[in-house]
Curated annotation (Swiss-Prot):
The keyword Nucleotidyltransferase applies. This is DNA-directed RNA polymerase subunit Rpo1C. Part of the RNA polymerase complex. GO terms for molecular function: DNA binding; DNA-directed RNA polymerase activity. GO terms for cellular component: cytoplasm; DNA-directed RNA polymerase complex. Pfam families: RNA_pol_Rpb1_5. It is an enzyme of class 2 (transferase). Its EC number is 2.7.7.6. The gene is rpo1C. It comes from Aeropyrum pernix (strain ATCC 700893 / DSM 11879 / JCM 9820 / NBRC 100138 / K1). Belongs to the RNA polymerase beta' chain family. It catalyses: RNA(n) + a ribonucleoside 5'-triphosphate = RNA(n+1) + diphosphate.
Amino acid sequence: MKEFKTLEESLEAARYILPESLYKELVETVEKEDGLSEEDKISVVKETIRTYLRSLAQPGEAVGTVAAQSIGEPGTQMTLRTFHYAGIMEFDVTLGLPRLIEIVDAKQTPSQPLMYIYLKDEYAKDLEKAKEAARKIEYTTLEKIIDNIEWDLGDRVVAIVINAEYMEDKGVTVDMVLEALDKSKLGKVVEDGVREVSEGGVKKVIVYFEISDKQLPDEELFNSNAYHKVLEKLKNTYIKGIKGIRKVTVRREEGEDSYEYMLIVEGSNLREVLMLPEVDHRRSISNDIQEIAQVLGIEAARTAIIEEIKRVLEDSGLDVDIRHLMLIADLMTWPGYVRQIGRLGVVGEKPSPLARAAFEVTVKQLYEAAVWGEEEEFAGVTENIIAGLPPRVGTGSVLLRMGAARK
């Protein structure tokens, strides 16, 4: 490597060689290190450039194959270790191989959608304000605050027994319940039909509700199945919250010299949650990659794929170079939407009929290729191996002609 006489000269060379983010970090590090001589700082810059150049893929390197191996091999260990659901806090979280498959298959919705919601400073430091934000987000129906619904065959009036503690926990008032019942169009609250009682020291509110004849015709008054259908609708009456958010838990996160409260959310509705004034939209994330692509764009989805795969591997105690994950994320997102790796995505869109046939549904792929008169260019690795030809990677990417002996 060229010898540099001054620090400025070495940094100028680094500016042309290193990525912008790495260059800025190098400059900041060198400038704030007062204990190093200029010669030492030049050595740091040279070593950074040398390390970066050594990290670059060589021309002809089969980076796709290496990336596949780098994730596939740890995947066999994940199968043995974590092919199950593990309880984290109060939620079931998909871990290990099942979650990895969800990510690379680009599932429309994950089996266990979760959101990690960070709050703005005025809410993040106050537990009560954080709880209030959680109550505002959680989708609350009548079923979540009642003990039971008492009813008798032949009587349209049912008694909805509401637990006052449940109401307080969910941030619901009696007026909110009455308004929700009025909007349900299942019937009406009878006049003076609200009573407060106490049973065994537990406060309860009983609401007497008359089911409309449209929901329960006279001929169905003695049909228990008809009653249960209406009562199920009654339990699902919406009171407040954001659709898709099933449960919210407040968690305290400790930093080096500070703390903050954040929300772990079971369910996902990124668009509406990010619009809330309490939410810090810069840090809040979801594990639903398709939703991220729709709400925040394809670049955000690419970052989410990298972070989700990285988290799955780390949870299993595995360490994979992030550049392999970046390559896979690029492959899944470069068309502008999130596509799966399999035959309905990356593999299925390959121009080579032999490469497509080698993955799945071989006969169908060959049949369709013949019908449409597709040509095999032998440009990829798979098709060349099938045909017994040297793949165009490594030394096979260079065409050589033997020189004839000169007379």
